[in-house]
A protein has these predicted regions:
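Membrane-embedded transmembrane helical bundles of large multi-pass transporters/channels
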Residues: 1-37, 136-381, 486, 496-691
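Structured non-transmembrane domains adjacent to transmembrane bundles in polytopic membrane proteins
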Residues: 47-67, 72-162, 378-379, 384-546, ...
Length: 691
C-alpha cells in the first residue's frame, strides 16, 4: 500500500481511529499506574562487577541489604533502648545494632571497648546502625524508612542511601505530574503565538499526549523504569515529536492550496508527505537513542528503549490520530486563525546568505573555547547533591558528618577462614589509611568487660557466618571525591593482601565503579551516535561531504551548550553530557536535514548557490523556529521548577540546547553551504540538474 492510499484510509476511518485511540488510554493508564519506578541509579551498574556481587552476598548470606545510621539526640538510655525495640519490630528491619546489643544498659559505658564507644556516641547523643533485609531501593526498605520516621521524634535523624532514595521518591512523585502540566501549558502558549491558529496547539498536545500515555503505559512490560526516565520521558517525547505535528500541519496547508480546498484529499496527501519526510528525521532521532543502549551502565538502556518507543508511537500518532483530530475540528481551527508572531523570515534569509562570512568567522572563533569548555565541565556523581538541602535524609547526613565525622561507610566481606589475628592486623592497617575514621569487626566488639561468649548470637550472626565475616569501615571523605576513590584503592590493596577474594562494598565503592564505567560508556555512546548519524546522512543525501559538514555543525552546537557550564562554574550531574548530547544531536539533525533537503531540491531544480540557499533558509527557518521555541518552552519551565537538580539541570540544558541549535542551524549551517557549495555539489548525488 502506498502512503497516499494509507492517508485516504486514515481520512475515511477518522472517527473509528479517534474512538480506538481514546479506548486505548484505559489499559495504557493502568499500565502507567502499575509500573514500578526505581529511584536508585546505582542499581543500573553491571551485575558482574565485584561491588554488585558483594551486595547480593550480603542479602543472600547475611540477610542484610541496606543499612542506615540512626542518630538520637538528648534521650535517656532507657528511652533509646525502648525506641530501638520498636524499630526492630518494623517490617523489613533485620537488626538494630547499639550499645545494648552488646551489654545491658546498666553496665557503665566506660567498660565498652573505647573504639566501639567512640563510634556510637557523640557529645550530643548516640547512634545506632539499622540493617534492613532488602536492598537499598526496594519497596520494603522504603516502607520501613517511612515507618521508622513516624516512630522517631524531632531529635532523631535517619541517614544513609536508603533514606536519600526514599526522599527522592517522595519528591519525584509530588513533582512529576507538574512537569507535564508546565511543559504542556508553556508549549501551547508558544505554539499558539508562532502558528497561525490558536486551536491547533491543543490538538497537537492531545495527540502527542495520547502517544505519551501509550509510551508510559507500555513500560509496564519492562517491570520497572528509572525515576529519571519517568520524569523526562513525557517532556522529551513532547519536544522530540512536536516537529512531526508541525510538519503535518504545514503540509496540510500546502495541499489545501494544491487541491483547491478539498480538505480530505489534501489531508491524505499531507499524511503521505509527512510520513515520507518524518521517516528520515525519526530514524536519526531513534539512532541517537539506540546509541544509549550500548552503555554497560543500563540506565542508558532504560532511557534509550523508552524514548525509541516514544518516537515510534509519536510518528504513528502524527499520521493517524492528529489528522483525524484536525479534520474533525476544522471549524474551530478556522475560527481561531491569526497571523503568527514571528519575525520576517525573508529579511533574515537574505541577510544570512549575504553576510555568511561573519557567521563562519564567529563559528571559528567560538569553536575552540566551546571544545575546551565541553571537555573541562565539572560533573558530580554523588546522588545527594541532586536534592534540596532541607530534606530529612540530607539533614541527617550533614549531622552524621558534623557530630560523628562520618561521611561514607564501607562494608568489607572477608572469608570466615581468615584467622582473627590476621583480621586484627588488617583492621590496624586500614585504620592508618588516610581518611579512615575507624574500622570495626566482631573482634573489635570484644573487650575486657565483654568476652566473645557474652555477645548475643544475633549480633555474632549479623557479623559472621560459615562463609564470610563482615567489617565496617568509616571514612571522613565524601562519596565520589578523588580522596575517597584513592582511599578505596588503598583499602582494596590491604584487603586483598589478607584475602584475595575479599570484597569492599557500599555506596562509595559502587560510585567509584560508576565513575569508571560511565567514563568508558560515554565515549562509546558518543562515537556510536556520531557514527550512526554520519552513516544515515551519507545514505540519505548520497553525499561524502554533507555528513562531515552537518555532523561538524551539530557537534559545534552541542559543544557550545555543554561548554557554557565550565565558564559559569556550574557542576552538572554525571549523566548530563550523554543524555543532552543524544537529545540535542537528534533535534539538531532534524533541523539540519529539513534545511539541507530543501537546499538539495533547489540546486537540483537549477537554482544557483545563493538563490538555492536563500530559498531553503526561507522555507525551513519558520518550522525550525517554531519547533525550537516550543521545545525551549516545554523544558525551561520544568528546569526552573524542579527541586531535583538532576531533572532541573537536564531540562535547562535541553532548553538552552534548543535555542543554540536553532541559532546554529539558522545562521551557521547556511553559511557553511555558501562556503562549501562547490565541494557539496561535486561530492553529492542529485544536487545538480540531470543533463
Amino acid at each position: 500500500m502506498n502512503m497516499v492510499a494509507f492517508g485516504k484510509k486514515v481520512v475515511k476511518f477518522r472517527i473509528p481511529i479517534l474512538i480506538i485511540s481514546i479506548l486505548l488510554l484505559i489499559p495504557a493508564g493502568l499500565g502507567y499506574v502499575n509500573t514500578r519506578v526505581n529511584y536508585d541509579v546505582l542499581t543500573y551498574l553491571p551485575e558482574d562487577i565485584e561491588t554488585m556481587q558483594g551486595q547480593d552476598i550480603l542479602v543472600k548470606d547475611f540477610g542484610t541489604g541496606a543499612f542506615s545510621m540512626f542518630i538520637v539526640d538528648g534521650m535517656e538510655d532507657k528511652e533509646v533502648s525502648a525506641l530501638k525495640a520498636k524499630i526492630e519490630n518494623v517490617e523489613h528491619v533485620q537488626k538494630v545494632l547499639w550499645y545494648d546489643s552488646l551489654a545491658d544498659i546498666s553496665m557503665p559505658k566506660s567498660m565498652i571497648p573505647k573504639d566501639v564507644y567512640e563510634v556510637f556516641n557523640s557529645d550530643t547523643g548516640t547512634m545506632m546502625a539499622i540493617f534492613f533485609d532488602e536492598g537499598t531501593s526496594s519497596d520494603g526498605t522504603m516502607e520501613a524508612i517511612g515507618k521508622i520516621r513516624k516512630l522517631a521524634g524531632k531529635q532523631c535523624f535517619l541517614s544513609g542511601m536508603s533514606a536519600i532514595v526514599t526522599d527522592t521518591k517522595n519528591l519525584a512523585e509530588k513533582e512529576t505530574p507538574l512537569y507535564v502540566l508546565i511543559a504542556v501549558v508553556l508549549a501551547v502558549i508558544v505554539l499558539g503565538l508562532t502558528m497561525d491558529s490558536y486551536f491547533i496547539p491543543l490538538l497537537f498536545m492531545l495527540s502527542i499526549g495520547m502517544a505519551i500515555v501509550y509510551n508510559l503505559g507500555s513500560n509496564y512490560f519492562f517491570g520497572e523504569i528509572s525515576y529519571i526516565t519517568k520524569a523526562l520521558a513525557a517532556v522529551l517525547q513532547l519536544g522530540v515529536t512536536l516537529d512531526y505535528s508541525i510538519f503535518l500541519m504545514h503540509s496540510y496547508e500546502e495541499q489545501q492550496v494544491r487541491y483547491n480546498g478539498d480538505k480530505e484529499r489534501a489531508m491524505a496527501h499531507a499524511i503521505s508527505q509527512t510520513f515520507s519526510s518524518v521517516i528520515g528525521s525519526s530514524v536519526t532521532t531513534v539512532a541517537g537513542f539506540i546509541a544509549l543502549c550500548f552503555m554497560t551502565f543500563t540506565l542508558g538502556m532504560d532511557i534509550g528503549v523508552v524514548m525509541v518507543k516514544g518516537v515510534i508511537l509519536g510518528v504513528i500518532a502524527c499520521v493517524t490520530i492528529l489528522p483525524s483530530m484536525i479534520l474533525c475540528c476544522d471549524k474551530w481551527i478556522m475560527k481561531t486563525m491569526h497571523k503568527p508572531f514571528l519575525p520576517d523570515i525573508g529579511k533574515i534569509s537574505d541577510k544570512v546568505t549575504k553576510r555568511y562570512m561573519i557567521y563562519v568567522i564567529l563559528f571559528l572563533v567560538l569553536l575552540f573555547p566551546a571544545i575546551y569548555g565541553n571537555n573541562h565541565t565539572a560533573v558530580y556523581y554523588n546522588l545527594d547533591e541532586t536534592l534540596p538541602k532541607d530534606l530529612p535524609s540530607i539533614i541527617a547526613n550533614e549531622k552524621l558528618k558534623k557530630d560523628y565525622d562520618m561521611n561514607t561507610t564501607h562494608m568489607i566481606l572477608v572469608d570466615s577462614s581468615v584467622e582473627s589475628a590476621d583480621v586484627a592486623k588488617m583492621i590496624d592497617k586500614m585504620d592508618d589509611v588516610d581518611g579512615v575514621k575507624w574500622a570495626l569487626g566482631l573482634d573489635a566488639l570484644i573487650g575486657p568487660a565483654i568476652p566473645q561468649d557474652m555477645i548475643p548470637n544475633s549480633v555474632t550472626d549479623m557479623l559472621k557466618n560459615d562463609k564470610y565475616q563482615l567489617l565496617l569501615v568509616n571514612s571522613e571523605y565524601k562519596v565520589a571525591s578523588d580522596e575517597l576513590n584513592a582511599q578505596i584503592k588503598d583499602l582494596n590493596k590491604i584487603l586483598h593482601k589478607y584475602d584475595k577474594g575479599g570484597m569492599l562494598i557500599g555506596g562509595g565503592p559502587l560510585t567509584a565503579d560508576l565513575i569508571d564505567i560511565t567514563d568508558t560508556d560515554f565515549k562509546t555512546v558518543s562515537m556510536v551516535s556520531i557514527g550512526i548519524i554520519f552513516v544515515i546522512i551519507l545514505i540519505l543525501f548520497k553525499s561524502i561531504s554533507l555528513p562531515v559538514i552537518l555532523v561538524g555543525v551539530i557537534e559545534f552546537a552541542i559543544f557550545v551548550n555543554m561548554g557554557i557550564p565550565y565558564y559559569t562554574g556550574t557542576k552538572l550531574p554525571f549523566v548530563a553530557s550523554i543524555i543532552i548530547g543524544t537529545i540535542q544531536l537528534g533535534s539538531t539533525v532534524d533541523y539540519a536535514i529539513l534545511m539541507t533537503t530543501r537546499y538539495k531540491r533547489e540546486r537540483n531544480h537549477g537554482a544557483e548557490k545563493y538563490d538555492a540557499i536563500t530559498t531553503a533558509h526561507r522555507a525551513s527557518a519558520q518550522s525550525i523556529m517554531v519547533s525550537a521555541l516550543s521545545f525551549f518552552a516545554a523544558t525551561i519551565g520544568v528546569g526552573l521548577y524542579s527541586n531535583i537538580d538532576m531533572i532541573s539541570s537536564l531540562c535547562i540544558l535541553m532548553a538552552r540546547g534548543a535555542i543554540i541549535s536553532m541559532i546554529v542551524v539558522i545562521f551557521v549551517l547556511p553559511s557553511m553551504f555558501m562556503v562549501f557549495d562547490k565541494v557539496i555539489v561535486k561530492t553529492s548525488k542529485g544536487f545538480l540538474p540531470a543533463k
